[in-house]
Amino acid sequence: MAGALALAVALPLGVQTIGGGAIANAAFDPNAEDFWVDSDMGGIKNRVWRAHDGNTSRVVYLLDGLRARDDLNGWEIETNVGPFLASQNINVVMPVGGESSFYSDWISTSNFNGQETKYSWESFLTQNLPNALANRYGFQSWNNGIIGISMGGSAALTLAAYHPQQFNYAGSLSGYLNISAPGMREAIRVAMLDAGRYNVDAMWGPPWNPAWLRNDPFVFANKLRDNNTRLWVSAGSGVPAPGDPSRHSLTDVVNTGSGSALEVLSVANSRAFQVKLAAIGAHNVTYNFQPRGVHSWRYWEPQIHDLAPDLSATIG
């Protein structure tokens, strides 16, 4: 039953994907800087907003969702959180690209879509990028924050767990934090096929490969507790709120229905993660579960405003 539910959720991802949204608010911000960094994947574009007070010690990385584009990060396309956080005296870094990557170091290139270069996003985000930011801007490479939506939410917790000196704050907004739950691995497989025809076996191997467990926040929750990582975990209920496009066209109906299903899966994962943290005595976390909300940018942008004081008090 759970597996069937997860697959049912994953199948419509071509309409509204994990990390997808329907409402664009910002698009290109001329006040941000392009910053290209060399890596094993080639040159990677990043967008940088400087803190208004000029400090170099307070830095946050914002991670995209499954359909991350190669021109701009979804956070810039769909929201205004870059300039907002900069106004709160936080330096903002948005890596660009990484479709279906889970921001992980992959085992191999994906053979389904002719991928030429193996993803090595974990290495990039924890080695190439912080070193380059330190050299170019003088940014501090420890006690940073990392926040992501959906796919990026899972990755944010993973990166914080295994790189605690770099990231002492991690936020998951509608993330998938229990990927060993029944049906989740199948759902991820289908979603990645839909978003770029990626073979999930190239990422973490077959379902029995230990790499799946290494990247499951539910499994490595004790690392976050032991590191005393400050966490922010949020999700909606899957119930649409006034203002969600649901009646104007068939596309609106399908998008909102898919967004509802995705958010139901996310909140179930996030609630299970909450139970796990409580069971192991991990309390350095804020949960922000909303009574309404689907898998959409219009809900993630307000979360950044909500968590900004907590982030500001922790990083640097």
Would you name each region that the model predicts?
Residues 5-11:
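Hydrophobic helical h-region of N-terminal Sec-dependent signal peptides
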Residues 2-3, 14-316:
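Non-catalytic cap/lid and distal C-terminal segments of serine-dependent acyl enzymes
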